[in-house]
Regions:
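Ordered, amphipathic secondary-structure segments that act as subunit-interaction surfaces
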Residues: 78-90
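Extended, low-charge hydrophobic alpha-helical regions
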Residues: 114, 135, 147-164
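A structural-propensity feature for long, helix-poor, extended segments
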Residues: 101-140
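Non-transmembrane, aqueous-exposed alpha-helical and coiled segments at domain scale
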Residues: 2, 27, 61-64, 101, ...
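Conserved small/polar residues in nucleotide/adenosyl-binding loops
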Residues: 178-183
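C-terminal binding/interaction regions
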Residues: 167-177
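Generic N-terminal targeting/processing segments that precede catalytic cores or assembly contacts
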Residues: 1-54, 67
Length: 184
């Protein structure tokens, strides 16, 4: 894919919501080990708000900005704050109705930069940053002009980064209170 259109991006968001909904119970069970067990419900609510907001989008900047604001206004908690910051950062670095691979890379880097302004967490702290930072770095390093290859490089790095957190000691959030190895 040489161009990412608004419609293709919306389809990706729809697919992401379906995947998250399918794992809602799993996410809540994992969260219940150290928290209140509502993460599955919260992330589904956040992605539902994102998808609802995206449906009226006609160009990237406006759509991503609306997605960021809506998720922060409609869903409480750190997940929605950080997800909102990510989309708002993306919106500052995306123009028009189509993006090429270079534009996608710039958009994701803008999202990461904005999240980094909202949190002190960094790679190695056992947070979402352990997946997000390597994902964006891998996307930047990908030399292909095929957007699917760029996104796949980011997805693989995100998964590897998340899996690398299993033996880590947390430096933020409720995980600070949990000393056993991460549940799988």
């Amino acid at each position: 894919m040489k161009q990412l259109t608004i419609e293709a991006f919306k389809a990706m968001l729809d697919n992401a919501l379906k995947q998250i909904k399918a794992r809602e119970e799993e996410f809540s069970k994992l969260d219940a080990v150290i928290g209140d067990g509502d993460h599955g419900t919260a992330i589904v609510a956040a992605m539902t708000a994102v998808n609802k907001s995206a449906q009226s989008g006609t160009e990237f900047k406006q759509m991503l900005g609306d997605m960021g604001m809506d998720v922060m206004m409609e869903v409480s908690g750190s997940t929605s704050t950080l997800l909102g910051a990510f989309f708002l950062g993306m919106s500052d670095h995306a123009e028009g109705t189509e993006l090429d691979a270079a534009g996608v890379k710039v958009m994701f880097a803008g999202g990461l930069a904005n999240v980094q302004q909202q949190t002190q967490a960094k790679r190695g702290d056992k947070t979402m940053m352990d997946a997000l930072i390597p994902a964006v770095e891998a996307m930047q390093a990908c030399t292909s002009d095929d957007i699917k290859e760029v996104l796949n490089a980011g997805a693989k790095a995100a998964l590897d980064g998340a899996e690398a957190t299993v033996p880590m000691k947390a430096n933020f959030g409720r995980c600070l209170l949990y000393t056993s190895p991460s549940p799988r």
